[in-house]
């Protein structure tokens, strides 16, 4: 069974690649050096520095493998070149009004989501509800606390 593709914006892909490069070129060799230094201090059975470095190494190697798997599955989301940016899709920045409050969100893939920075997942209740709609439409958003009605003010 083929694994599901993961939508990602150009900025998100670049950030993922930069993190991968940093971990492989800087953190991995740094941790290897720390482990070697800790080994040189004698008995590793009760060496806190060695234990901490091995823990860090496991975390870093796990993250490297995770990023490698993500990079195999990502699908770069490009903005349409035909000029039709009026439909909400992954990569769109959308301004909505809910109960008189105006919010602006960028719809991104789940791996890029950071709600505190206004980047919401296309899989979140708000993101999922907005996809495929246009400015001027009123869209129901199903949340754990009930249904909210959002008016789409602008799509960029």
Swiss-Prot record:
<keyword id="KW-0805">Transcription regulation</keyword>
<dbReference type="InterPro" id="IPR022691">
    <property type="entry name" value="Tscrpt_elong_fac_GreA/B_N"/>
</dbReference>
<dbReference type="InterPro" id="IPR023459">
    <property type="entry name" value="Tscrpt_elong_fac_GreA/B_fam"/>
</dbReference>
<comment type="function">
    <text>Necessary for efficient RNA polymerase transcription elongation past template-encoded arresting sites. The arresting sites in DNA have the property of trapping a certain fraction of elongating RNA polymerases that pass through, resulting in locked ternary complexes. Cleavage of the nascent transcript by cleavage factors such as GreA or GreB allows the resumption of elongation from the new 3'terminus. GreA releases sequences of 2 to 3 nucleotides.</text>
</comment>
<dbReference type="GO" id="GO:0003677">
    <property type="term" value="F:DNA binding"/>
</dbReference>
<keyword id="KW-0804">Transcription</keyword>
<comment type="similarity">
    <text>Belongs to the GreA/GreB family.</text>
</comment>
<dbReference type="GO" id="GO:0006354">
    <property type="term" value="P:DNA-templated transcription elongation"/>
</dbReference>
<dbReference type="InterPro" id="IPR018151">
    <property type="entry name" value="TF_GreA/GreB_CS"/>
</dbReference>
<dbReference type="InterPro" id="IPR028624">
    <property type="entry name" value="Tscrpt_elong_fac_GreA/B"/>
</dbReference>
<dbReference type="InterPro" id="IPR001437">
    <property type="entry name" value="Tscrpt_elong_fac_GreA/B_C"/>
</dbReference>
<dbReference type="GO" id="GO:0032784">
    <property type="term" value="P:regulation of DNA-templated transcription elongation"/>
</dbReference>
<dbReference type="GO" id="GO:0070063">
    <property type="term" value="F:RNA polymerase binding"/>
</dbReference>
<keyword id="KW-0238">DNA-binding</keyword>
<dbReference type="Pfam" id="PF01272">
    <property type="entry name" value="GreA_GreB"/>
</dbReference>
<protein>
    <recommendedName>
        <fullName>Transcription elongation factor GreA</fullName>
    </recommendedName>
</protein>
<dbReference type="InterPro" id="IPR036953">
    <property type="entry name" value="GreA/GreB_C_sf"/>
</dbReference>
<dbReference type="InterPro" id="IPR006359">
    <property type="entry name" value="Tscrpt_elong_fac_GreA"/>
</dbReference>
<dbReference type="Pfam" id="PF03449">
    <property type="entry name" value="GreA_GreB_N"/>
</dbReference>
<dbReference type="InterPro" id="IPR036805">
    <property type="entry name" value="Tscrpt_elong_fac_GreA/B_N_sf"/>
</dbReference>
């Amino acid at each position: 069974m083929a694994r599901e593709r993961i939508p990602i914006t150009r900025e998100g892909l670049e950030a993922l690649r930069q993190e991968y490069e940093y971990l492989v070129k800087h953190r991995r060799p740094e941790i290897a050096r720390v482990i070697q230094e800790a080994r040189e201090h004698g008995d590793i059975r009760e060496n806190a520095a060695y234990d901490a470095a091995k823990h860090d190494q496991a975390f870093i190697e796990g993250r490297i493998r995770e990023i490698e798997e993500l990079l195999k599955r990502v699908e770069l989301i490009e903005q349409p070149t035909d000029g039709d940016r009026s439909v909400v899709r992954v990569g769109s920045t959308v301004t909505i009004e809910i109960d008189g409050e105006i919010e602006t969100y960028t719809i991104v893939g789940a791996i890029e989501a950071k709600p505190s920075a206004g980047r919401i997942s296309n899989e979140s209740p708000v993101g999922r509800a907005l996809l495929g709609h246009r400015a001027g439409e009123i869209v129901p958003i199903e949340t754990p606390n009930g249904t909210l009605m959002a008016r789409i003010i602008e799509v960029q």
